[in-house]
Amino acid sequence: MPSQRIECDVLVVGGGMAGATAALAAREGGARVVIARKAPGSTGLSGGAVSVAQDPGCMPDTPFAARAGVVESARRIAATRPGHPYRLLRDRLDRLWNAVEFATGQLSAVLAPPTGRNRWILTPFGHAHPAATCHRSMAGGDLAEVRGTLVVCGFEGHLGWDPGLVAAGAERVRPLGGPASRPILLDMFRWEEESLGRPFDLARRLEAPGAAEEAGRVLRRVLRRGDAAAVLPPVLGLDPDARVAERMAVEAGIPVAEFLSDLPSVPGLRLHRAVEARLAAAGVEVLQGEVRAGAGPDLPASVGGREVVARSWVLASGRFVGGGIERRGELREGVLGLPVLASEGPFADPSIRFAARPPASITLRDSRAPQPLLAAGLRVDDELHPLDAEGRVVHPRVFAAGAVVGGHDPASDGTGMGVAMFTGWLAGRSAAWRDA
C-alpha cells in the first residue's frame, strides 16, 4: 500500500493556467511538484484566445499595423494602472515574453506560436478580439493577415451561431486593415438529432473518419473567386491530433479556422486536456481535493486524503470562479485565510475594511471604470510574496500567481492569460529556487 504522505519541493494550489505554468516552470528547475486542486479552474471555460495585453493608448480607429506590440502594450498598461500586476512587476516586464513563450511552448499541441503582435480573432458576438496567440485551429482567421475575402460560416438549420452577426464584426474593422467578409450557411448537421446538437457533440462528429473531409467539400461548393479563408463555429474537434481544420482545408482549398467560443467552450476543454497531458508528461503529480489543515511550507497539509509537506507553496487558486477568493462574512483567500484587498481606486487604502463591505458598495456605476470588487485579490510584493493587512510578507516561501493576485479583472481588461502565464512562470521559478 503506497504511503499517504508526500514530501515535495513545491506545492501548487490550483490547476488553471497560472498553476500549470508555475508547476511546469518549477519542474523544469528540477523540483518535485504537486498540484492540489478542487476543480479544473477557469482555463477550461476559456474561448480560445490568449490575451496578454492590448494597447491602452490607441484610438478605436488605429490600424492594426500601427498598434503597439504585446510587450510594449504591457508596459503602457503598467504606466497607467497603478494597481495592476504589470505595474508591480514593471522591472521584470522584459521577461514577460519569455514567460509567454514558455507557457505556449509547453502547450504547443494546441496553441499557435506567438509572434510578438496581437492577432485579431472574431468572437461569436460580432467583435474582433486581440490576442497574443490563440488555438492553432484559430490562427488562420487572423483578421490582420487574411488577404482576400473571409468566408464566415454557420450551419444551416442550427441555432447556435449567427454567421451574419460574426461577419459584421469583420466588416467593422475592415478600415483598420481587416478583410472583406461574407456570411454563408453550410448544409451540415441538419438532421434532427444534430440540428440542436451541443458543441461537444458536433466536435466529436467532425473528428470521425471522413467527416472533416466531407465538411471541406461542402465548403468548397459554396466558395467564390477571391475567397481567401473561412472561419467556422468553434467545434473543429476536441482532440488536436484529429486535425479537423487541416483536413477540411485540404478539401476546401483554402485555410479553415474557428472563431472564438462562448460557453460551453470546446476550445476551453481542448486546452484543459492539453494542460492535463503536459502535466502528466512532465511528472507533475495532481491531487484532487481541497487543501485542508494547511498552514504553509514545511507543515503538513491534507489534500484528498493525502498528507503533503512542501518546502515552497504557490497559491494559484483563482478568484471567484476558481474558488481562490471566498466570501464567508467577508472576502478571504480560501487556503491560508489571507486578507483580500483592493489594489487601486478609492478602496486601495489598507486601513479601509474593504473585504467586509457589502458587494454593492464596492462596485462603481460606470461599467467602464476598474471595478474594485472584480479586481479584488491578494496584495503581493515584487517577488510575488503575499502580504498581510499591514503590508508584511506572510512567508518567504509562499508565492501567489494568476487571478488570486489582485489589481486586474481577467474578464474585462485583456490581460488575464498574460498575468497567469507571467506570474505563474515567475512564481514557479522562485519556488524552485530559480529566481527569474
Task: Name what the model sees in each region.
Residues 38-78, 191-203:
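Conserved N-terminal glycine-rich FAD pyrophosphate-binding loop of Rossmann-like flavoproteins
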Residues 9-35, 424:
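N-terminal Rossmann-like FAD-binding beta1-loop-alpha1 element of flavoenzymes
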Residues 83-84, 140-160, 180-183, 192-201, ...:
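Helix-loop-beta segment of a Rossmann-like dinucleotide-binding subdomain
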Residues 10-13, 34-36, 291-292, 307-320:
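Short hydrophobic core segments
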Residues 24, 47, 322-334, 395-396, ...:
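A conserved FAD-binding loop/helix module that cradles the flavin
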Residues 166-174, 209-231, 237-292:
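Helical element adjacent to the flavin cofactor pocket in flavoenzyme catalytic cores
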Residues 85-151, 264-301:
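Feature captures the FAD/FMN-dependent oxidoreductase FAD-binding
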Residues 285-287, 309-316, 320-406:
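A glycine-rich dinucleotide-binding beta-alpha-beta segment and adjacent secondary-structure elements
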